[in-house]
Amino acid sequence: MRSISFKLLLLVSLLVVVSRYTLAYEDSCSTDEECRRNCLCDVAYCDKSRDKCDYGFMNRVDVRFPKHPYISKNKDGSGR
């Protein structure tokens, strides 16, 4: 019984998160406060040129290379 209720709780929470994301992602807006209410976060703002909410962390993916690579190189360019 405990296992079933835990799985049900996980399923319901996943559905809530997905539905909030899809409903709030492309909202039209006129003020920053509208976007922050939809997102329930502080990083959202209204892009007034497009009249759409920009949620910051949800719209961007950081694909930069790390500053310190895992394989260190010597001054002559060799691996170790």
Swiss-Prot record:
Residues 1-24 form the signal peptide. One of its GO terms (cellular component) is plasmodesma. Keywords: Antimicrobial, Disulfide bond, Fungicide, Plant defense, Secreted, Signal. GO terms for biological process: defense response to fungus; killing of cells of another organism. Disulfide bonds join C29-C46, C35-C53. It is found in: Secreted. It comes from the Eukaryota. Its main location: secreted. Belongs to the DEFL family. This is Defensin-like protein 255. It comes from Arabidopsis thaliana.
